[in-house]
Amino acid sequence: LNDDQLRKIRLAKDIILERFNEPPTLVELSEEINLGLRQLKQGFKETYGKPVFQYLLDYKMDKAAKLLSDGKYNVNEVSIELGYSNSSHFIHAFKKKFGITPLSFIKQS
């Protein structure tokens, strides 16, 4: 990657983290940063070690773990905060990442 491409990849990361609860599609993102879709996908994975939406999912799950361990939010509130349309999608994603349900995670915290 050249400096300009790297700058655009970093911008892409900033954009998806800023709008994590309503992220743009890959096509929208590539248009917004003015970088080809293929270059975006390859460059992002090369720079951050994982595909765009895996990076975003990991970010959301880490954020979920922080919010849940704070004890101020219940599972449904965290689900809404992270932009999930329903809590069952959130619970499934959380369990896939951490191996336990959010409720079990809260009890262990």
Locate each region found by the language model.
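Membrane-proximal linker segments that couple transmembrane helices to downstream signaling/catalytic modules
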Residues: 1-8, 18-22, 31-34
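Short coil turns linking two alpha-helices in DNA-binding domains
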Residues: 33-37, 85-86
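Short hydrophobic/aromatic patch on the recognition helix
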Residues: 39-40, 44, 89-90, 94
